Structure formats: structure tokens, C-alpha cells
Amino acid sequence: MARRPKGRFIDGIVLLDKDTGMSSNFALQRVKRFFNANKAGHTGALDPLATGMLPICLGEATKFSQHLLDSDKRYLVTAKLGQRTDTSDSDGEVVQTRPVNVTQALLDEKLAFFRGTTQQIPSMYSALKYQGQPLYKYAREGIEVPRESRPITVFELNFIKLEGDELTLDIHCSKGTYIRTIIDDLGEMLGCGAHVVMLRRTQVAEYPYEKMVTLAQLEALLEQAHRQDVAPQTLMDPLLLPMDTAVAKFAEINLPEAMLYYVMQGQAIQAAGLKPDELVRITIGDERRFVGMGIMNDDGLLAPKRLIVIHDNDAAE
């Protein structure tokens, strides 16, 4: 007999405002437990030091988490000038201390280097894998392994303030950009060294900052539900964003209700107005219910590519 998953069949996205000092996986497991979800996944880890936006996908939304992983991000970062650490942040050991003689003109000149598309070598203290192991595991053992540089794009890099030896920047960048590495590289270019002391992710894709919720707020809602003797989901589920917000950047094709059966069977269907190899969101009926993604194949047909499982919301045993 097949084993049924624990938790509810609940689909949606929680915009978690992660606290500092916790891993992204710890935060993920707390959210999963608060919502009593049968399945959950995050969309790109934040360092324990970092705070801010960590979209948590529940249920069928996990099928589309890769699109958020691939999306642009925005960060507010404060760097301490004059000290370089082995991890490029304040969680590491100081390995070099130098005087800070940074003028605004020098800073503006060096910041300009990072704007646009450049090559970046990932930090050894990152989750990127080498021969199946995260780089940080090698780093903790004092082993340095080869890393290939990879292209990143910094769309915006805005100077916020320089107070004493602390520099604050606003950075809008492509996926896979290591902010710690930018700060470490900038410190070397300035001739004084630098490391991250505060990092906050303020945006993922187009998700609004004001929709974020903390673990403390979720816990408070759970306690409120217990006090009022109501089901926790009545207070918590309204916080969920629709799962198709993860793929909002793709065009939508709306099909009549009669086509639902064929789509869910994975059959390619006639659809007008699509370009070859174009990935689209598929919605059904006047209510525009999202059922998954599709792509135009070589025969000029829309082929379902990633479909959700349609289920009722009864809790699993």
C-alpha cells in the first residue's frame, strides 16, 4: 500500500522575511510545519548572516521554483572597510587589516567596474558544488579547489552612504551573483580590504517587499488560531501568493474549459499566436485557473510541459 504524504495538499508561495543567524533550510522547515504542508522548497538559499526575501514554495508551487531561482535579485549590503575575512563576511576570521584611505572619487571609479556584465569567481565559502560536495565543506577543511569564472550582470549598483569605515550599497543583479565576492573584490580594488557585515535581500523577481512575513508573525498567527479555536489555515492561508506568480513573466494562453481534459492528459493541442519554442502559462476557463506550463513544438502545437496535480484540499493522513 502506497504511503501517503504527511501534511496538507496546499499550493502557494510564502514570501518569508528570513531572520539573521538561521539557515535557509531551517527557515524552510519552520514554514512547512506552520502551514502543515505536504511539500515545500525554497528558491535560492540566503547565507545565515543574511536577512530578507526568501520565497517558500508549497505543494505544486515547487514545480516552478526554478523560475524564481533564475530570476533577478536585489540586495542592500553594508561592508566594513579595512578588514578582509576568510569568508568575506563577519562570520569569518579576520585575515588582513589595512588602513582606509577611500575618497568618494576613488569609490565611484571602482564601483563603475562592477556595473554591467562581468566575470565572477565564486567564493570558496559558497554552496556551489565541486565533485558533489559544496565548496564551503572544502573551505572548512582548508582545501581550495578550482572554480571557473562565470558571467554575472549587475543591472544597478547604487551608492547609499559611507559612514566612517562602513559602506552601504544597493545592488540589483542577475542570478548566481555572490554579493560577498563583489564586496571582497571591491575591497581589494580600494586597497584596504572589506567584508560584509549586513546583507538583506529586498527583492526576488517582481515580488513586492511589503508582502513579506516573518517566522515570528507566522508563529503569532498559529497561537492566535489556537486561542480562537479555529483552524490555523483560516488565518495563514490568506498570506499565500498564487503559485503562477512564480511564472508571471511568461505570456498566458487561456483555453476553454473543454480543453482541460486533453491538457491534463499531456496531449498537444492547437493554439494560435505562439512563437516556436515559446514557453507560456496555461490557464483554463473564464476563471483563468492556472494548470501549468506549455511550449509550442515543431508541429505548431502547444505541448504541455509542466502541469500541476489538481487535488482537493483535504489533509493527508
UniProtKB/Swiss-Prot annotation:
It catalyses: uridine(55) in tRNA = pseudouridine(55) in tRNA. GO terms for molecular function: RNA binding; tRNA pseudouridine(55) synthase activity. One of its GO terms (biological process) is mRNA pseudouridine synthesis. Keywords: Isomerase, tRNA processing. InterPro entries: PsdUridine_synth_cat_dom_sf (IPR020103), PsdUridine_synth_N (IPR002501), PUA-like_sf (IPR015947), PUA_sf (IPR036974), tRNA_psdUridine_synth_TruB (IPR014780), tRNA_sdUridine_synth_fam1_C (IPR015240), TruB_C (IPR032819). Its EC number is 5.4.99.25. The active site is at D47. It comes from the Bacteria. Responsible for synthesis of pseudouridine from uracil-55 in the psi GC loop of transfer RNAs. PANTHER family: PSEUDOURIDYLATE SYNTHASE TRUB1, TRNA-PSEUDOURIDINE SYNTHASE. Belongs to the pseudouridine synthase TruB family. Type 1 subfamily. This is tRNA pseudouridine synthase B. It comes from Shewanella frigidimarina (strain NCIMB 400). The gene is truB.
